[in-house]
A protein has these predicted regions:
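Short, small/hydrophobic-biased targeting/export segments
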Residues: 1-63
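N-terminal export/assembly leaders
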Residues: 64-165
Length: 165
């Protein structure tokens, strides 16, 4: 079978364990292979790359280039087992992943915090427990804004505002 991403990348899958991360708001499409075999194809340009287990392929949507590297697969696929693993991860990237994992909008007001990196593994902690742990490592405070009901009866996502001080 194959997976089509919004940016036009097609990932052909052959009896594998893999992860594709393809968010519209991100500059990269990431494919990580745990086992088996995948081919990543960009139909518009006729370009393809093949991955071996333990490899990651990033497609830079701006430069239109593939970049292949070795990767700690467990960090990229642990979410499937209910774990979040961060290895040398910036605070900004960590908050993006937490936002996706917990389906909340996290607004990080102080981009100067990109200099902070973390190494952590979370198994069953709630978002608020994780934010409490982070605030013990970094001078950080956070506030939660409840969802707002829209005119059509639906609700916005819960919003979490993170500030460094």
């Amino acid at each position: 079978f194959y997976v089509n991403t919004p940016s036009g990348i097609r990932v052909y899958v052959y009896g594998t364990r893999f992860n594709v991360s393809a968010y519209e708001s991100e500059d990269y499409v990431e494919t990580v292979l745990e086992s088996g075999h995948v081919s990543v194809f960009m139909p518009v340009y006729g370009t393809s790359e093949t991955l071996n287990p333990g490899e990651r392929l990033l497609f830079d949507k701006k430069a239109l280039q593939f970049m292949k590297s070795k990767v700690d697969v467990s960090e990229k696929t642990a979410w499937k087992d209910g774990k979040l693993i961060f290895r040398n991860t910036s605070l900004d990237e960590m908050l993006k992943r937490l936002s996706r994992h917990f389906n909340v909008d996290i607004h990080f007001n102080n981009k100067s915090g990109k200099n902070y990196t973390f190494r952590a593994t979370f198994r069953n902690e709630s978002l608020f427990q994780i934010l409490d742990y982070l605030s013990k490592s970094v001078s950080m405070k956070w506030n939660v804004e409840d969802p707002v009901q829209l005119s059509d009866g639906t609700f916005t996502k819960r919003k979490v505002i993170v500030d460094l001080y």
